[in-house]
Amino acid sequence: LEFRRVLFRSAEQNMKHRILVINPGSTSTKIAVFEGKEKLFDTTLRYSTEELASFGWVMEQVDFRRATIEKALADNNIDPDSLDAICARGGQVPYCAAGTYRVDQAMVDFMYTRRQGAHASNLGCVLALLLAKPLGIPAYIVDPVMVDEMDDVARVSGLPELPRKMQGHALNCRAMAIRCADEVLHKPLADCRLIVLHLGGGGSCRLFVDGRMVDCVRDDEWMFAPERFGGAAIQDVVTLCYSGKYTESEMMGFVRGKGGLVAHLGTSNAIEVEKRIEEGDSHAKLVYDGMLYSNVRAIGALAAAADGKIDRIILTGGLAHSKYVAAYITKKVSFIAPVEVMAGEFEL
């Protein structure tokens, strides 16, 4: 499968094209219409558990989500014929460099082969092409979750069969890196050295050197998160896998969904956990601080990989809204570089 990476000329970048942006998540689809850099309209289309329960797997939701998008555009007086292009969140495509890619039928067909661990982001390119084709306009994806620009030396693990690979929150991390370079450092991303820590239900940490994501700590490596196990000593993990206590499916559930705060405290809600800490729950504090400590270690490791030369450390994702989280991490890592809190997501 080959992808066509799109390089836009500077003149094209300055033109005011009208673009529909689609960001499918597990229980919602965020959409927005931009004209140049101006956002004309945005909304989040939320779906109930009952609405999604009838679908066997995520790719069966295509027609349902397409109809909700078309209705939202009509309800907000957005004429589809006024659009110049459609751009979507990129899903689990083969590993690729960061950038913008033209969606074609081959990419769409590939999404239907990703049954194991299929993610809602896989719907993005499918929806984009379905909506774009009748209009005669192009469809694109940007910075899919499989962006991998890792340096060769960083790929080497202690087992030849298991080279390290980059995966995670590429879209939001790169968007925040670009914003920080532009608005804070006032220089191109290509001239920056940044560490971006994404803090959400899952987390990942990425190192940017000269504009490239050259290394990362994934959400299934050793930093844990509200819904992610992260990692432990491999010997202990292997022993647990073969203990007969858990099935493969249950173990994979700990990796994403039932690990982290969920496993320790029975909830992934950070607001609830912080409330328990305020009320004197010492166990909740130990676990919560342990999670943040694991994130701090990831930042430190990537800083060392960059010879300690870092312009900014960026905290992003929903959990970065927490003053507790920002204060804990900033206190630990500000000796490396100034910390920029850019909470939330910038994925539209």
Annotated model-derived regions:
Residues L1-L7:
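Short, small-residue-biased leader/transition segments that mark boundaries at the very start
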Residues I19-E60, D219:
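Short glycine-rich, Thr/Ser-proximal phosphate-binding strand/loop in the N-terminal lobe
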Residues L73-A120, P138, M146-S157:
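Short beta-strand-loop/turn "lid" adjacent to the catalytic site in phosphate-handling enzymes
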Residues G253-G308:
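Adenine-nucleotide phosphate-binding core of ATP-dependent small-molecule kinases
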Residues K323, A327-L348:
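Conserved phosphate-binding/catalytic loops in two-lobed NTP-binding clefts
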